[in-house]
Amino acid sequence: MHGLLLAGLAAALPLGVAGLPARQQSGLSPRGIDINPYRFASMAKYSEHKATSQMVHSFSYSKDDDYVATATKLVKSTFPNMTFRTVKDHYIGTNGIGHVHFKQTAHGIDIDNADFNVNIGRDGKVFTFGNSFYEGEMPKTNPLTKRDFADPVKALHGAIKTLKLPVKPQSAKAMPMKEAETFMFEGTSGALSEPMAKLVYIQKDGKLHLTWRVETDVGDNWLLSYVDSKETETVHNVVDYVASADYKVFAWGLNDPTEGQPTMIKDPWNTTGSGSPFTWHGDGEMDYTVTRGNNIAAQDNPSGGGQWENNYRPESPELSFVYEYNEQMEPEQFKDFAITQLFYTTNTFHDLLYSFGFTEEAGNFQMNNNGKGGEGNDFAICNAQDGSGTNNANFATPPDGQNGRMRMYTWTTAQPSRDGDLEAGIVIHEYAHGLSNRLCGGPANSNCLSELEAGGMGEGWGDFYATAIRLKQDDTRETDYTMGEWAANMEGGIREYPYSTNMQTNPYTYADVEGMSEVHGIGTVWATILYDVLWNLIDEHGMSKNIMPKFVNGAPSDGRNLAMKLVLDGMTLMPCNPNFVQARDAIIDADQALTNGQNKCALMKAFSKRGLGSNYKHGKNRVNNFDMPADC
């Protein structure tokens, strides 16, 4: 999660680091760096499928072009006088849609928040696209000619001073890397990895600003700080990545210890599809007898430090991870059980998301991509009972090819203390931050949920997946669910309202976002809308009791899994830093691509109920629209 935490806690997390709450709870306080004053402004535009289909009739195609070439032609025709580069993370999703991402440049230097994403349909034509390209006046001179900007060491000092980062630059020295104007700093302390800097432009207030993008991983935050290239104590914007065998465990679908008892589960990867070809304890080269494999390395981390490889993990030569737990035990007494539970939950979610399309090419978290594309070497590092905090959790999501990092904390809200590793909804929420940060804007760009409304949707997606997965067979659309209630020991959970289709129980509509300035509150609104989407699709298609979906013509046959698939596919279509309206359109477009639009009216019924009706146009102020499309 961008922090599962309660409302004041979340804003402090880093780029990709996500944390939990929304309702205030005694004993909880903000941790880390508050990046809200430094968030990028929203600039993305999105052309949904219907508008794109009408527009591209005049677009020149060649049957000999591949999908990347077609996408490139669209960008060139849209902005013929601009320069850009193709990001090396294009792929074809499981729904047959090709995804290509471009980065705008000026004088060969990236404009870091200027992106163009093109989605190509099965017919080879442009399906949808979005962009945030800068259209203002370009710098007339190449800054690399005069080099009248500060060196990267000064930028590092500026970021540390302005943001009060716990990094000591001491005798920092900038060492050049292979990529132009990119440096790694030696001689620092306080960060979990060596800080980095890269010279980039950003667009802000209608102008381009040359900046040093300073990257610092300080645990609770993994930041990209855009420091002015001349006035190095001026930080323009900040992005945070931290947005965190036999097994005796709480089985998939049990959210927490109040819903059932631990049971024995044998070789669970046999029931979770093709996402783990090496099982959960191998990576194609090594076989492990601990809670480590191709997808996940789960261990304790009582010190809260950045070292993980040699930390304690349960070990069993027979792969029998069977440990005791009862509610009277303190967390350190059931450490083995907690690590095993975390390993089980994250691996199962990995495999489920794989079936929906979060594959190697899409930027998932795996050590060995088995020749299927993507960067690899980036399994998720999952720390149980992490000592760096309490009463929260977070997940850091750097770009594809770098490890995701989850940190699960104990909760001092009850006696004995409770362990977030045992509340599956918290774990799923956190891992979903990795999903959304890798899919939105492409796997090579983890900066695409950095604006306030987009970051709120990142929180909402986490709650949505956590809630969808915990549904029971006898639930109905009248069933309500809370978030974090067990771990926080808080009746009603950590969100302002429970998730409910009842407008009296949860009255949120899109207009409520207008007065919000914190991602968890915004996320609760988004997840509320998606909860209505979920139940509309379940009412249409039913709900399977199986862990993995059954696919018919590429689409899950039941409503719960169809909702999760469409939400995931929507992430791949929408532009970098989307708003609610663009996300709505992307989900509608995802259904068009997957089912030829069979669920359009069920989807729009949910969106319009909560204020995102068919005639809503995103403007300066958020005012509800409850209209339904004429063909519904």
From Swiss-Prot:
GO CC annotation terms, alphabetical: extracellular region
Entry's localization field: Secreted
UniProt xrefs under CDD domains: M36
EC number(s) stated in the UniProt entry for this protein: 3.4.24.-
Enzyme class: hydrolase
Identification of the protein by name: Extracellular metalloproteinase 2
Active site: E430
Pfam families with a match to the protein in the record: FTP (PF07504), Peptidase_M36 (PF02128)
Cofactor binding notes: Binds 1 zinc ion per subunit.
Transmembrane helix recorded as keyword: no
Pro-piece positions: 20-244
Positions annotated as glycosylated: N270
BP GO annotations: proteolysis
Record's function text: Secreted metalloproteinase probably acting as a virulence factor.
Organism of this sequence: Arthroderma benhamiae (Trichophyton mentagrophytes)
Keyword set includes Transcription regulation: no
InterPro entries noted in UniProt: FTP_domain, Fungal_virulence_M36, Peptidase_M36, Peptidase_M4/M1_CTD_sf
Any one Gene Ontology molecular-function term assigned to this protein's record: zinc ion binding
Cofactors (names): Zn(2+)
PANTHER family: EXTRACELLULAR METALLOPROTEINASE MEP
Signal peptide: 1-19
Binding, Zn(2+): H429, H433
Entry's family note: Belongs to the peptidase M36 family.
Keywords from the UniProt entry: Glycoprotein, Hydrolase, Metal-binding, Metalloprotease, Protease, Secreted, Signal, Virulence, Zinc, Zymogen
Main subcellular location: secreted
